[in-house]
Amino acid sequence: MTMAKQAHPLGLYLHIPFCRSKCAYCDFYSLSGREDRMDAYTAALERHLIEVAPQAAQHLVDTVYFGGGTPSYLGEKRLVKLLKAVKKHYHVDPHAEITLEANPDSAGDWKALRALRRAGFNRISLGVQSTDDVCLRALGRIHTWQQVQEAVAACRRAKFPDVSLDLIYGLPGQTMEQWEKTLSDALTLQPEHLSCYGLKLEEGTPLYRQRDSLTLPDDEAQADMYLYAVEYLRQNGY
């Protein structure tokens, strides 16, 4: 494609709704146990990318983000197919940031990650949330801290230059000491980026329905966790 006129850059977001299982706090649109729909969804998303491409004809795409759901659960072949469609029908900056959200339980195969890296993905965002297996179970997460370490090692082996970790504070029963340990554990993996979010109980989620029986850090404790993260990460170069 040739660009008649360059306007402001665009970011593309591709939603991949499939999950192995739905987490207790998540209110994003996602489907668990529907692997039978993956091929049809991939084909439909590719058609949609082609249909709307003319609207972006005068724009350079500088970011591409595959979110979900659990995009890594779609499998590398389908993901590569979608990224090829993006590159074919859009003006993607050669230096564009191309991110794939992944859960640690579906990001441990370094050969699959290498295929994604070779296709053009250059950033992995891992939904770690906690390094404490008890906290992870309370969230309905199906991975372990061991799998987090294995996933990051696989990303490094596959030559991903940018690995980001998502963490959540204010979890049911979480203490400041547990949060401090989660942060220190996370830094042992030397991620390029960390995102820290306060837990929010969204209406309609399992955690929201259980809210009266949960022991949650109060607002002051959550604020302390936030401030600790800001200072601790600043001291460590983030």
Over which residues does each language-model region extend?
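Local cysteine-cluster metal-coordination motifs and their immediate loop/turn environment
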Residues: 17-30
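C-terminal scaffold of the Radical SAM
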Residues: 2-9, 30-55, 59-238
